[in-house]
C-alpha cells in the first residue's frame, strides 16, 4: 500500500515577538520560528493551523501544498 502524501504549509515570521505576551512567544517557538523573515515548512494539521491562527498577526502563510 502506498504512503499517503502529507500536506505541508510554509509560514514566515513577519512580526517581532518583542513586547508580546509570553504565550504568543511560546507559540512562535512551537512553530519553529525565532527570527524575523524565517520560514518553516510544517505538516498541515489542525493543531498547526490553530497555532498559526493564534499568532496570525505575527506570521504569514507563504505556501500551502
Curated annotation (Swiss-Prot):
InterPro entries noted in UniProt: Ribo_uL30_ferredoxin-like_sf (IPR036919), Ribosomal_uL30_bac-type (IPR005996), Ribosomal_uL30_ferredoxin-like (IPR016082)
CDD domains: Ribosomal_L30 (cd01658)
Keywords: Ribonucleoprotein, Ribosomal protein
SUPFAM superfamilies: Ribosomal protein L30p/L7e (SSF55129)
Annotated family: Belongs to the universal ribosomal protein uL30 family.
UniProt xrefs under HAMAP family: Ribosomal_uL30_B
Entry protein name: Large ribosomal subunit protein uL30
